[in-house]
Amino acid sequence: MTVAVCLQAPTIFERRVIADATAVPIGTIMKLEDANTVVVSAASADPFGGIAWEEHTASEGITEMTVAMNGRWQIVTTAAAIPVGNSVSIGGADTCRLSTEADTIVGTRFGKCLNEIGGGGGTAIVEVGQLI
């Protein structure tokens, strides 16, 4: 699994609830589920719940974790093109894709792509938390 790589440290963090049995590596893109609860993102159009800032080891009795809500990250993209400066959304497990209008409504937009991504996909530099 390829996770997001931090290029510029975030300054905004949230504490989220997570199931004790879930193992999460640092840099995993998280899906916001319910009442401040996150799970590992696995599908396109998942609502953004942050990027894992700490490892969560399964079955240690810990049910909270810290996620980053901003910063600059290197994130693998889906196979679609992303023009520089466009917003990105969750594209699946630890990937991003070009945002659509519908993504604004459901809360999947999470950042701005700072480099041009061609039609075959690639690795985006994403300013997380920056949408304008």
Which residues fall in each region the model found?
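Surface-exposed, low-hydrophobicity beta-strand/loop segments enriched in small/polar/acidic residues
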Residues: M1-I132
